[in-house]
Amino acid sequence: MTPTSYLATLARLGWTPAGLARQLGRSGNTVANWTRPGYRVPDDVAAWLERRLDAHDRWMRDDPPPSP
């Protein structure tokens, strides 16, 4: 997962790096580093985020918000 796709995934989920750090029990600096060149999101975290995004997309498709 690239820094760009990592940030895009968090944005689609409505999450921040700080919030993700709390959920994962990791330091804010560690999670923030994943947005920088030369760092990478660990494979297990990337897979978990992709599963969360898939679940979110299914949920939004199957139960969309009410129309205005």
How should each PLM-predicted stretch be described?
Residues T9, Q23, W34:
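Residues in the recognition helix of alpha-helical DNA-binding motifs
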Residues G19-A21:
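Short alpha-helical "recognition helix" segments of helix-turn-helix
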